Amino acid sequence: LVTTFITDEELWACTQCNACVQECPVNINPASLILDMRRYQVMEESKAPTGLNTVFQNIENNGAPWQFSQDDRMLWAEDLNVPLMSDGKNPDYLFWIGSAGAFDDRYKKVTREFIKILNHVGIDYAVLGTEESDSGDVARRSGNEMLFQMQAMMNVEILNGYDVKNIITCDPHDFNTIKNEYPDFGGNYNVYHHSQFLQELIDNGKINLDGKEFADKKITFHDPCYLGRGNGEYDAPRSVLDAMPVKNVEMKRNKSFSLCCGAGGGQMFKEAEKGDKEVFMERTEEAISTGCDIIATACPFCMVMMTDGLKYKNKDEEIKNYDIAELVSASLNI
């Protein structure tokens, strides 16, 4: 099919956002078909965009899409005194950091702020530390099914070895993978995206957000594809924002009709195909048009793309991009 009916450019431009699946009037799953074709190219023809081949090698060698050492996976936690599963405790929750949360400079700040919230509330948690490895999401969406399954089986073995029951993560991609795909490999857990966990803390009265720092600010929330369309969670992040004295404004395309940031499906790690406009620029312009002061995100990939978009539009001084964990932490003054 590829090159005959579908070009390589079309095949690899897909962000796996699943908007086509939602809109298809005859219930065809185009995203799944695209993924099958990517698998054929990668597994049978050893063919993939250059950037993705590098990602595959990095995950296989280092347990992350970037060329960082596995031993550096806890550098983000310097001076935070974060408990480890290997300490021998059996906590209520495992906080799954994810590769972006451990290595991406911008999202490491989000990881630290969420840890501060957990400590502030007194949540019984621990992390895997250097035992954690990439979830395999990027490998699977990019067609490298063998690498994904290797990562999944390895992670499930470690998680089950610690008898983990409840997992929290800030990454919607890892949230989706661990919740919906790890059960196929014997990994059955209660998995929470951090927006859901924060909403639960607010609903139970464990945190109260005065949000004075953001009083009367206009905030627009960008729905991550794998939190929203992928798992039907639209209310939790908005409920968290509603707990602050801010004015929430919606983008034209929101919730189930939200536009992808453009980073999913491996796009984060490769050059974009030629076109009139990159997806992240379209989404950034849509956010800017709301007149917002802050773009709230809840995904490391979305964070990168929206931040880059604001810089390209020379709006990064006027409009800020924060993860909801950062907004909550600032509201708690911790």
What are the functions of these language-model segments?
Residues 101-190, 226-334:
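Cofactor-cradling patches in redox/metallo enzymes
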Residues 189-197:
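Short, conserved active-site entrance elements at the starts or edges of catalytic domains
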Residues 1-182, 186, 201:
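Iron-sulfur-cluster electron-transfer modules
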Residues 201-217, 262-268, 331-334:
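Short, surface-exposed amphipathic charged segments that create phosphate/polyanion-binding patches used
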Residues 203-241:
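C-terminal amphipathic alpha-helical segment
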Residues 90, 215-217, 292:
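Phosphate-coordination loops involved in phosphoryl transfer and adenosine-cofactor binding
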Residues 1-16, 215, 222, 275, ...:
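Ferredoxin-like iron-sulfur electron-transfer modules
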